[in-house]
Amino acid sequence: MSSSVTGEPIPGGESLPFPPTPSGSIAGRTMQESVYSPRPKERRLHDDAPNILIVLIDDAGPGLPSGLGGEVNTPTLDAMLQDGVGYNRFHTTAMCSPTRASLLTGRNHHRVGNGQIAELANDWDGYSGHIPRSSATGPEVLRHYGYSTAAFGKWHNTPAEETTAAGPFDNWPTGLGFEYFYGFLAGEASQYEPNLVRNTTVVLPPKTPEQGYHLSEDLADDAIGWLRRHKAFDADKPFFMYWASGCLHGPHHIMKPWADKYAGKFDDGWDAYRERVFARAKEKGWIPPEAELTDRDPTMAAWDEIPDDEKPFQRRLMEVAAGYAEHCDVQVGRLFDELDRLGYRDDTLILYIWGDNGSSGEGQNGTISELLAQNGIPTTPAQHIAALEELGGLDVLGSPKTDNMYHAGWAWAGSAPYKGMKLLASHLGGTRNPMVVRWPAKVTPDPAPRTHFLHCNDVVPTLYDIVGITPPRTVNGVPQDPVDGASFAQTLVEPGATGESSPSTSRSWAAGRSTTTAGWRPRSGHAHPGRRVRPVASATGARTTTRGSSTTWTRTGPRIGTSPSSTRRSWRNCGNCSRSRPRRTMRSPSAAGCGSSHCIPNSGSRRRTRAGSSPATRSACPSSVLPRWATRTTGSPSTSPRRRIRAECSTHWEATPADSRASSTTATSVTSTTCSS
């Protein structure tokens, strides 16, 4: 195996597309005076440039896959864990459109106009829903260098009003670097009757539900067909494929035999499931042995609080979801098998990302129609159960008759061991997703997970680094924005590889936000639809919930990178620190720099700890680089408690750089104390 996976820089890529190669032919006055010289076939890529396949699962947390301690069978992901390397501190944005835009461009999601989902696109900077031409996608750049590019499945990066058959098409996949697309332009789709598009043409599914159609199978079939055509017509060109299934997003649609495989497996509920997953994740080494399981949120219903006559409904919803997830992973396996059959296995770099955010609690109390929950239409589980009886009972869950989605308690369990879930950018349950990388030609399998702090905007710069591409200054005449991510290529072959500094990343959405800079993570969490799940007695008997918000600082480990650039425009950057590039680690969270509070250790203060844990010296929080939302207070606690944002500091247990696995999860002793800096 190679000790390096980075490619030699390819010259001449500052401006794309490349200028045409002049012809060597000369047209004279006569045939005898003319000279014909065949134009050489252009190849700018190195001979060992790999094929690239990115698999992105939807709305799936780390507490589900069997290979990571979960109870959902994922044979393909499990095999990749044996054949590749896993990353247990890879981060998303807690929301689908932002994660996908960041993943495909290598930039912060606000920089590329995707601060929220495409359906909520508006005229505000950062929220337009348009990936700007000043931030060319990775596939667009790779295409100019000679890659064939194709995308399959969910495309959630086009404003809804631009997704009709009338176009415009410049913000569709084929306008953003992909030569071929087959899938749907939305956040979700029926798995039995999806609205499909091939390139820019609306098409019907090849089969009906009665004939056995399922979207995940169709996407695998079409991708396999594309691979075969590529092998036949462009065998000398490497390919970039983006395969983004709509699973595990609602509605949870799967054929009954797949759901029946899990009958009885979840009878003891989400609390017990979460504890089992946590214990097995430790056994498998995915989380550190000293980690502590985070508590259930006060707004989340305990399984014991669910009425006995409602529990069969809640169990079956999870059985259906588990069958749905396994079925999708099996389709990914079919795609991998075709790569092997075509001889692509060794030279294909695969990134299997399990979730664009954490598991989704948008089903709230469990529903037979997820849109009822998402649109705030009040219902009770009893009403859903009564409707199911008219449709045929629990067995119709997962069928075309329902658009079911499980209780948020299952989403919380599926995001174990972390707190939160999808939409909660303030907590790791919304933003920390497993990633497994396989590249047989270059990467030696390693059963121990990599613990480097990574973000989805690191993927594109990593691919550039491997191929030998320098980010272009202009693309199609448009000056390019800087790439925010940093390459983690060398960590594929060197488990101990580290960067020199801690660049910033941010994750934010209306339901919460967090950012990471200089090894700190301030976060602000708010109530969201997935948390309206705890039954509270009221005069009418209706279920209500409590709301609130909080902001805390959490210490994180060092992040791979080359420069401490911020990705939030609200940062107040310290120029001297940026110039001196101080190194920060878990042992030395502060370093010589500008002399401001975030560069001065506050060794005289000690943080409070949970009972049984040892105190650790706390360094001053980086207050001079606090985002404005982490420092402001609106209203007084007595007059507007829901609007008050507390600026606090908190740290993890103390860890050393040599034991980076100790910082691989925040599911350990974390306490808060008011910042003194």
Segments from the language model and where they lie:
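Formylglycine-dependent sulfatase
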Residues: 1-544, 548, 557-576, 588-590, ...
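Carbohydrate-binding surfaces in secreted/extracellular proteins
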Residues: 677
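Glycan-recognition/cleft segments
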Residues: 649-672
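Polyanion-binding and phosphate-handling cores
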Residues: 577-584
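Substrate/cofactor-recognition hotspot
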Residues: 589-601
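Cytosolic coiled-coil signaling helices that couple upstream sensory modules
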Residues: 551-552
